[in-house]
């Protein structure tokens, strides 16, 4: 008997347990859907913070008998609770908007393997049984596909914790007829991807979209001899490296995307920010209603007067109504030098009385105002144990 045989036997047992865990997680999600249906009838909020905290406390107590530490149980069940909350939110939204689509065509930046492609898959997995992929070369093409009916939804990045706002997308939001109907966040884990055996010092040219280069500039500064070559998406960079099949070429992108192109990870990169997260927006031709049982966001686009304090006056309206603003972004108005538009994300349902009152006041003091959309907030703040 070789020394590896006991290890293989143990791994087989672990694999069998993993399959049992998957089956149990599927059963738990099915029960979460039943809970969502019950809340739909009783009109109770999706989130019950007291129940979530009591659940964590009970599981931590039970875990001690199995020698499982509190941190491990907390992290594991926070993720399970998040999935339950988002699953119930999707259920309530489908019922309210009478949408139960079997499939949808989603437009995103880049071919398969781009971060936008991964975000589109994430959104589709929770909302549709199937989704038809429609990769685009430019952000403008994504908007055009949905505006003209070639696609049902657009998934576009709007901001990143490391490189900041995606200005091209903000500019397109100024003029589009589309409405924001959803959001999601994707953790970005960049890797140096190569086609075969090589090392970091052998690489001469690195391909990627401008965003990964910005987000990983500290890492890249260690290799000043690398030539930086910009591509329209991370997946386009991967395609180039796969086709070149050279030890001197590499791409910056995700491990999952690299696998789709037959690339392997040479190095996992530490981005400039410890948490490198990109927020994506989902847009459609028709605005949606958001259940008052679900935490909501409303995104506005306003233009204020040129007089001193005009923006402050607008923001005071939100404060006076106890509305929480989670994002404020300014962009120039094309054709009007030195004038700016302001994008505001507000934690409120568009149809709520307080939001309607605030909109009325804002309409009286701003030069223009546009509601870009009201949509369910995907930021499920984890509950900590007592």
Where are these regions (language model features)?
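Domain-level signature for soluble enzymes in the chorismate/prephenate branch of the shikimate pathway
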Residues: 1-386
């Amino acid at each position: 008997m070789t020394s590896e045989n006991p290890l293989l036997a143990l791994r087989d047992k672990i694999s069998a347990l993993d399959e049992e865990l998957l089956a149990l997680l599927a059963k738990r999600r099915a029960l979460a859907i039943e809970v969502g249906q019950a809340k739909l009838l009783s009109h109770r909020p999706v989130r019950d913070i007291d129940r979530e905290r009591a659940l964590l406390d009970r599981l931590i107590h039970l875990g001690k008998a199995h020698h499982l530490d509190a941190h491990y149980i907390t992290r594991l069940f926070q993720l399970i609770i998040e999935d339950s909350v988002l699953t119930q939110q999707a259920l309530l939204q489908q019922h309210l908007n009478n949408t139960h689509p079997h499939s949808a065509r989603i437009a995103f930046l880049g071919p398969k393997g781009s971060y936008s492609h991964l975000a589109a898959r994430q959104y589709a997995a929770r909302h549709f049984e199937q989704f038809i992929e429609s990769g685009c070369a430019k952000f403008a093409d994504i908007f055009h596909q949905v505006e003209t009916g070639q696609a049902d939804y657009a998934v576009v990045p709007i901001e990143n914790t490391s490189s900041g706002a995606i200005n091209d997308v903000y500019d397109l939001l100024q003029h589009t007829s589309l409405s924001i109907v959803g959001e999601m966040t994707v953790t970005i884990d960049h890797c140096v991807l190569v086609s075969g055996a090589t090392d970091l010092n052998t690489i001469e040219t690195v391909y990627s979209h401008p965003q990964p280069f910005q987000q990983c500039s500290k890492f890249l500064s260690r290799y000043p001899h690398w030539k930086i070559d910009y591509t329209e998406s991370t997946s386009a960079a991967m395609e180039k490296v796969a086709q070149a099949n050279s030890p001197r070429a590499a791409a910056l992108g995700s491990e999952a995307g690299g696998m789709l192109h037959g690339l392997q990870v040479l190095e996992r990169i530490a981005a400039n920010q410890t948490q490198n997260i990109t927020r994506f927006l989902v847009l459609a031709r028709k605005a949606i209603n958001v259940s008052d049982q679900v935490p909501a966001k409303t995104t506005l686009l306003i233009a204020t007067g040129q007089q001193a304090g005009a923006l402050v006056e607008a923001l005071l309206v939100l404060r006076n109504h106890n509305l929480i603003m989670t994002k404020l972004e300014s962009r120039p108005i094309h054709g009007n030098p030195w004038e700016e538009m302001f994008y505001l994300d507000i934690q409120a349902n568009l149809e709520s009385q307080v939001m309607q009152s605030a909109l009325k006041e804002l309409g009286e003091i701003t030069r223009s105002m546009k509601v870009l959309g009201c949509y369910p907030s995907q930021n499920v703040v984890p509950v900590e144990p007592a």
